[in-house]
Amino acid sequence: MWKLKIAEGGSPWLRTVNNHVGRQVWEFDPKLGSPEDLLEIEKARQNFHDNRFTHKHSADLLMRIHFAKENPMNEVLPKVRVKDIEDVTEETVKTTLRRAINFHSTLQSHDGHWPGDYGGPMFLMPGLVITLSITGALNAVLTEEHRKEICRYLYNHQNKDGGWGLHIEGPSTMFGSVLNYVALRLLGEGPNDRQGEMEKGRDWILGHGGATFITSWGKMWLSVLGVYEWSGNNPLPPEIWLLPYVLPIHPGRMWCHCRMVYLPMSYLYGKRFVGPITPTILSLRKELYTIPYHDIDWNQARNLCAKEDLYYPHPLVQDILWASLHKFLEPILMHWPGKKLREMAIKTAIEHIHYEDDNTRYLCIGPVNKVLNMLCCWVEDPNSEAFKLHLPRIYDYLWIAEDGMKMQGYNGSQLWDTAFTAQAIISSNLIEEYGPTLRKAHTYIKNSQVLEDCPGDLSKWYRHISKGAWPFSTADHGWPISDCTAEGLKAVLLLSKIAPEIVGEPLDAKRLYDAVNVILSLQNEDGGFATYELTRSYTWLELINPAETFGDIVIDYPYVECTSAAIQALTSFKKLYPGHRREEIQCCIEKAASFIEKTQASDGSWYGSWGVCFTYGTWFGVKGLIAAGKSFNNCSSIRKACEFLLSKQLPSGGWGESYLSCQNKVYSNVESNRSHVVNTGWAMLALIDAEQAKRDPTPLHRAAVYLINSQMENGDFPQQEIMGVFNKNCMITYAAYRNVFPIWALGEYRHRVLQSQ
């Protein structure tokens, strides 16, 4: 049976700044689990498999089974059902809240955070499998049980047509189909294994033109593996790292996720590295293409991309740029004397790779550059300490649920989920009852603040200050983020108002000042806040976005969510510490509020870039403006936002927005106009904040009916469609949202609507 280990090290090759707080790793123990446990797990797996085409999202049941043993519930209060809004009383809401928080508290780990599934993208695991296969570490790192669960996951998320999507709910793409087919082959599956699944996968690939039509990221992965030629790639010259920083196209000016992925890619491209050519590789060269491998026109293949993958088609200027670099510059850099420059660029690239590895304790900023950096360290020296330090950190990215083992989009969402959960529980006003839960959450948040800047000259490494920030996941990861810092600060400020004998000692004021300093340092000239850093270049740089699958990746754009979170945190801070940097904070809030007003769409919504979608963005838009001192009466933006939200309420009383809203930028309901507990939570929170109850509380009562009746027998809420997103087009799982936002919305509803009536 699989066991979730929390905050444990266990390897001499692991480094940590805070004793591994927040680390979550699944380990298989053959001796663990009674026959009843194993039967329950098998039932969950079979149930997922049988319904995989209608319910594509797992419900994180293995973790729930694990915690039911570790943190059993003392009592399960009887479920409440309400027929109509007349049945919604303070007592029914309180019971629903207690049932929900009782259950959610059992999912809290001993270090105070809420673990959970952060999977969703389907292009992450293949990168890991390819890297481990090339380096010969596949069987050493992934046990037979790991490999079995990874195969289960890949087969479970194969679409009916035989292909694989960009993410678990998406239609088949060439990027997803080729990479997942290749991953299965490298994991030991034969070309005709299973009940025709491999054949169906191959038929989808060949029926859509073959692997020459894969996206640029896919071309790079296939090239290092040896099943595609480097000459079929558009150039990724490492020399870009030698350009002066003053140029707008310098990678140091790009969004950190973008530059940190293209950094190791440029190293591998500069070296034209190809892994060992094995019989499986030779076989894949035959399996993936519609014509013999040696007959492929690689120059023509450079710009081929399947229409299913084409979210961001290359503008003409990009095709001209890549063709010029490919034809004229690359031949010079591949031969003496130009080769000297190439060697210098490769040396610079690997220095930046090592800096990133060292300062994230070998977690790296995300899963894509994690495995690429690991491969680069092996290419530089297969016996290097750096490669060995990378290996144990692979497990930080692996998560298992009833659909199998997946690679997550980060090493988890620990701080983010814990900060939200603390705010949600506090909103319920049941603070004393859940004091132990809040105390543990408080401890986790305090232990996860980043206490130092990265070492050395930050400008040399293109890094922003970190001291005082909160990361998305763990202190070991350490990359500072504007909204994570804001949500962390909001949570500790709320907790500081509660008696320390209930929730523990408050955070030292100096550490609060450090957090405020980070937030203030991240405001752009237009008043908006981007994610990790300031916006360092121009939007026209998107013209050279080479990733056909993703939108808006080249620079760190300002977002309504980050801007709103910053306003909320600074407003909360200002109330408790009115003397600290008062004028700067006030000026920052005013500029940020003006940015939010400017970015509102004509229909009253805001586009959400990190959650689905207009419901999420509009919750942040409204919350930010209200925190800045505006109200329904004096702000037309808030009035329009309320109108927008009310126009989307469904007959069931809830809201339900599809991920299609994100990619198409047009509001779309979930299929069959079903409501969703998470969207409903966001919409309720926005409307309650905008004092909807004073005008007409009926929409809020109807939403409360939907949430109360959605609660499951054990106090959990159902896992519905996927609710997280990044880069406009790729969806990601936030497993805790189904619990956090119904709790938060009903908590606010109880004390700001029912108790104030």
Swiss-Prot record:
GO MF, one example: cycloartenol synthase activity
Expression triggers: No effect of methyl jasmonate (MeJA) or gibberellin A3 (GA3).
The keyword Transcription belongs to this UniProt entry's keyword annotation: no
Pfam family, one: SQHop_cyclase_C
PFTB repeat start-end pairs: 147-188, 512-557, 589-629, 638-679, 700-741
Origin superkingdom: Eukaryota
A GO CC annotation given for this chain: lipid droplet
Residues at the active site: 483 (proton donor)
EC number: 5.4.99.8
Protein family according to the UniProt entry: Belongs to the terpene cyclase/mutase family.
Protein name as it appears in the record: Cycloartenol synthase
Source organism per UniProt: Glycyrrhiza glabra
